[in-house]
Each structure stands twice: as C-alpha cells, then as structure tokens.
Swiss-Prot record:
Name the record gives this protein: Afimbrial adhesin AFA-III
Species of provenance: Escherichia coli
Keyword line: Fimbrium, Plasmid, Signal
Source lineage: Bacteria, Pseudomonadati, Pseudomonadota, Gammaproteobacteria, Enterobacterales
Similarity comment: Belongs to the Dr-adhesin family.
InterPro entries (alphabetical): Adhesin_Dr, Adhesin_Dr_signal_peptide, Adhesion_dom_sf, Dr_adhesin_sf
Amino acid sequence: MKKLAIMAAASMVFAVSSAHAGFTPSGTTGTTKLTVTEECQVRVGDLTVAKTRGQLTDAAPIGPVTVQALGCNARQVALKADTDNFEQGKFFLISDNNRDKLYVNIRPMDNSAWTTDNGVFYKNDVGSWGGTIGIYVDGQQTNTPPGNYTLTLTGGYWAK
C-alpha cells in the first residue's frame, strides 16, 4: 500500500510538471534544402546574338556556346536538344510563333570527335570536358522570316 501511494505521488508530480512544459516560438525559422545531382555535371552557356537575313548563308557562324563538364570521368559529355529543336536528324532554332525554323549544325570548336543521335550531341570519348561548341547555319536560309529564334540544349551525359 505504501508502495502504491509513492507511485501515485510520483505520477502526480510528473503530470503536474509536464502539463506546464511546451514550445513557444520566439525566433526565426530556418530551412535546410538539399539537391542531389549526378556526379557528371554539364553546364551549357547562353548565347544571344542578332543576325540579318543576309548573314544566314550556309555554314555561317551563329556563335559559340560554352560547355563545362565536371565529374564525368567515365561518362560521355552530351547536349540534348528540346523536342521543339530537333526533327528528322536535324537541329534547328524555332521561332517564337513555333512555326518558322532555322536549321543549324553543331560542331565542337576544338576539333574533338562528337556524334549526333536522335537529338543528342555527345562526345565520343569519356571524361570531363570544357570548351566551346559552334552553332552554324545549315543551308542557305536568307529567306528566314524576321523574329526571335531559340535553340535549347540541356547538358547531361550519354549512356549506351
């Protein structure tokens, strides 16, 4: 009986003391965010340029695009065109109205060997790479309607 009384008293003390405890916010809230990425990081630069229609002759350069690939030791660096920028084996810039196309070729400017496969332009050798690819007019396109044209390339790696 004495033991039961002690247990009851201990329960009362615990209940009383825990009833008054609680969290009161009085500061700021911090957030922890984590993005998990592939080891092979391929960053593709931006290019903005203006050309007259008369400059859109076959093989005329549109401009250089920088590519920086890190951590790609056993991977082949690759660039993938959006579905709006590739059809029937050809890359193109698409107009803002999504009707007009300006066909282009993509070539590395360091003479390294690359291959195109279904909208993916990839380096034949594995390993990290930093350099520049050139975007060139494919065919005579001096009749291209004026407007804004876009080619979107996403960096990644090629896996066979």
